[in-house]
Amino acid sequence: MAEASSANLGSGCEEKRHEGSSSESVPPGTTISRVKLLDTMVDTFLQKLVAAGSYQRFTDCYKCFYQLQPAMTQQIYDKFIAQLQTSIREEISDIKEEGNLEAVLNALDKIVEEGKVRKEPAWRPSGIPEKDLHSVMAPYFLQQRDTLRRHVQKQEAENQQLADAVLAGRRQVEELQLQVQAQQQAWQALHREQRELVAVLREPE
């Protein structure tokens, strides 16, 4: 029974492999996207993994249990293989999402396609290291300089806004101080007038 199950599993893998190869067949010269190649590599890996962990090897590891419960052993093996494939596919999907691999691979495909239709000759070293280094590094440093300059200008503008806000706050404080002084002087003048009025009222006739 183990041999029959192993044979059935192997034939199933072979059928899937032939189906995959027929569906994945493309005309010569056709470029396959890197995302498609990655998915094909994952499928091939899973097929080889299932082939390496055949049912025959599984039953060899659990001979006693297989002799007692052959049907249960088959069910456990099928469930184990299915969960293993699902777990691997989910892990690879998480890696693709975390690394944004599909976007990166599609960008690489786009760069390659643009390079095919590019008319100007590709860059080649001149044989003079200093010249080659300058031609490569100079644009990079110029770009970095422009980036830093924009950051500096942005920071200066923010600093100027903060300085203007501080000056406006100082003016408000000064105005409040003047208002307080004016109110204090007015209160003192009113207090003097009240005292003078009280003194006048207390004078004998």
Swiss-Prot record:
- Tell me, what is one Gene Ontology molecular-function annotation carried by this entry? transcription coactivator activity
What does the UniProt entry say about where the protein is found?
Nucleus; Chromosome, Centromere, Kinetochore
Tissue specificity of this protein: Highest levels of expression in heart and skeletal muscle, with significant levels expressed in kidney and liver.
Gene Ontology terms, cellular component aspect? cytosol; Golgi apparatus; intracellular membrane-bounded organelle; kinetochore; MIS12/MIND type complex; nucleoplasm; nucleus; outer kinetochore
Q: Name one Pfam family in it.
A: Nnf1
Q: Which UniProt keywords apply?
A: Activator, Cell cycle, Cell division, Centromere, Chromosome, Chromosome partition, Coiled coil, Kinetochore, Mitosis, Nucleus, Transcription, Transcription regulation
Q: Where is this region: Disordered?
A: 1-30
Please list the coiled coil stretches: 141-193
Biological process annotations from GO: attachment of spindle microtubules to kinetochore; cell division; chromosome segregation; transcription by RNA polymerase II
**Induction pattern:** By polyamine analogs in analog-sensitive H157 cells.
Query: What does the record note on quaternary structure?
Result: Component of the MIS12 complex composed of MIS12, DSN1, NSL1 and PMF1. Interacts with COPS7A. Interacts via its coiled-coil domain with the leucine-zipper domain of NFE2L2. The interaction with NFE2L2 is required for the transcriptional regulation of SSAT.
Q: What function does the entry list?
A: Part of the MIS12 complex which is required for normal chromosome alignment and segregation and kinetochore formation during mitosis. May act as a cotranscription partner of NFE2L2 involved in regulation of polyamine-induced transcription of SSAT.
> What is this protein identified as?
Polyamine-modulated factor 1
The organism encoding this protein is Homo sapiens
